[in-house]
Amino acid sequence: MTRRKSRKDAWMPPRVYRGKSAYEYHPKGGGAIRLCKLDAKNWEVLKAHEDAVQALEAKENLSGLVSDFFESADFSDLSKTTQADYRKYSRKVLSVFGKVHPDNLEPRHVRAYMDKRGAKSKTQANREKAFLSRCYRWAYERGLVKQNPCKGVKQFKETARDRYVEDWEYKAVFENAPPHVQAAMEISYLCAARKGDVLSMTWDQIRDEGIFIQQGKTNVKQIKEWTPRLRKAIDLAKSLRTGNIISRWVICQANGKCYTGRGFDQGWMDAREAARAITNMALDFTFHDLKAKSISDYEGSTKDKQIFSGHKTERQVNTYDRKVKVVPSLDRS
């Protein structure tokens, strides 16, 4: 039964009472939330109550659920790359569904989101739906939601990228790139390394046997053996620092600081634009395509390429193996 208030407490919001040492808010779900001391002014109590109500509402919507997921052990077990991707996907999803109660989200709502988002990017729509499903799966296993609204909602069919970077294209961009982009291009190509793994590379990864790389996405650990060309790329990276600047980053700015993805991308795009102006060719490949070129150019079987690239399955390797195969023709005279 709701406690009656005296006349002098009539100014207080519903479910706010004087406790033994503080004003308290008793929400419908039970419990008591301490607002402020008993000597607080009326406006301070009202403000504390408003903040408490908003905090509770946030906990009860999808934004609150996603926030809890991001603080969970399951999320911390994911690779740093996946964590960053999920945070990026969450911004798009929560801009639409953030204030919705998790149990009120239905498959038809997810489908509508997919259709609208897919009009711009089917790939991103798929990734964002996969993130949302992962979040709901975590919540469902803990009794926080009644269902996963993503279950049964079809993803868009994706066409695997098949862009192969020709040697002359690589050379054209390389020759117009600044030293830090040149060094990153070579390390990525020679080691089949992702951009993120190259930019986060530190000097303690440079070993006697080669370059130690733990892939940010798969956590696979490898040491890429030295070749003369790879040593030359590392020597180029050493020249990036100026004066007595010391940096732990292999690919660093003149002041020793590491490059952000966006900062590095600007140098990459400038080099590609300069090469386009000279060659009058499209050069429509991305930095990530250099990893595919590396795997495609590596001589050997699919299993050999898998060992080289660090992929967990041969199917993943096939996605990156894009070089058109030269096969015998019929010789019938």
Q: How does the language model describe each region?
A:
Residues T227-M281, S294:
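Active-site/catalytic core of tyrosine-dependent DNA strand-transfer enzymes
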Residues K5-S6, P14-Y23, P27-R108:
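N-terminal DNA-binding module of tyrosine recombinases/phage integrases
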Residues A172, Q222-K238, I307, R315-S333:
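DNA/chromatin major-groove-contacting recognition/catalytic segments
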Residues T123, A183-E186, L190, D197, ...:
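C-terminal catalytic core of tyrosine-transesterase DNA break-rejoin enzymes
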Residues N126, E141, V145, K151-K195, ...:
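Basic, Lys/Arg- and aromatic-enriched nucleic-acid-binding interface segment
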Residues A160, E169-A172, C191, G196-T242:
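Conserved tyrosine-mediated DNA breakage-rejoining catalytic core shared by Y-recombinases
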Residues A73-L144, C258-G263, D284-T286:
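N-terminal core-binding DNA-recognition domain of tyrosine site-specific recombinases/integrases
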